[in-house]
């Protein structure tokens, strides 16, 4: 919000990744639109590398007040009922822990060149644009563009804990490719870490905590899309180092500091944090050699410490 981008564009897998945005007494659970939709001055775009569930997208545009500024690239792939059915049974569901959204089977059909595209769907006709073209027009006018990804680095099809991964590449380079943005046009890469590690479904997790320990620490969470309880472990510096390397990160954002340090809830300046929280942030910076510039201290969009100059 502070950076006032004229475009907020989503790359990544979709709609198997859910994001929760809180604005006062309103809670938005998002699967298709980028979280930056709250910025009323920004166009909200979905890049051509993203697969789209038209029903979910149209519902979000209507319910979240994004009509007239939400658009979809003509080359976005389309999730159909057959993809959801394939995703909700068999090994994908039972062994990999798929969310059942149809994302994986749709991406598989895209690789086989049989997937329908957004430009072929009548209900999306008034939302169809050329997303890369709009992005580059904005950049030529020296406007800010915010590119938002989905999932996490270690759910990447190439770099993650295969086979317990999502169906495509979700590191920064993959997200940029999804929206048609070349590497020389990227100014900053902000890698987002929770103050502890979570994972939904199956797959490896170092130093995983028992459910009782998770509850005792107050770290209990449930997936936005599936509602399944999230597994948890303490902050993992080795994973963080690897994520920074794979994403060429220039800044770190830490979320849920208030869950780890409840006294920090709602704070908006670093000086207000208690000593334990300050030491936690300093240890991250000293160990990872990257500045922590954004700190989330609560679910509301305004519960943020922004340390950028």
Predicted ranges, named:
Residues 1-309:
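Non-transmembrane, aqueous-exposed alpha-helical and coiled segments at domain scale
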